[in-house]
Amino acid sequence: MKIRQILSIGCFLWILASLRLAAQQPEIQPLPIDPKIRYGQLNNGLTYYIRHNAQPKDRADFFIAQNVGSILEDENQRGLAHFLEHMAFDGTKNFPGHGMDEFTESIGMRGGENFNAYTSFDETVYMIMNAPVTRESIVDSCLLILHDWSG
């Protein structure tokens, strides 16, 4: 009986101490945004971040991150987010069939290396990396691909 009382008091004190420590945790502050980044939110809810980089010269990276991943899948949907990620490379409204492949190859880029995506627990990210932006039409096409990927 005495051991049970001692254990009960010990557990109570441990819980009390844990709650006190949890209450003392400082509030997590958001990371500061680099002042060189221009950002905002469009009327449709899309948040954008733009930063100029001088190196590598005449090259740019384009990303679109969607807040969807495997965590949102029901049991009968396992793998759906990853499957849809792959399907985005099989043609889009503005780049039907192998149109994206033809475009990226025409400007010296390769799928997998410069043109890729991944799906994780809570996000799906599409990437166009190290794109030669020597012509405005290339930038326009890269943004159009991101638009198509956004659904």
Predicted regions and their residues:
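Generic marker of residues within folded, mature protein domains
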Residues: 13, 30, 54, 116-118
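Histidine-acidic residue clusters that define the catalytic metal-binding segment
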Residues: 24-38, 129, 136, 140, ...
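Mature N-terminal segment immediately following signal peptide/propeptide cleavage
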Residues: 26-65
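Bacterial Sec-dependent N-terminal signal peptides
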Residues: 1-25
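Short low-complexity stretches enriched in small and charged residues
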Residues: 20-23, 38-41, 79-87
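Active-site-adjacent, His/Asp/Glu-enriched structural segments that form or flank metal-binding
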Residues: 56, 66-81, 85-151
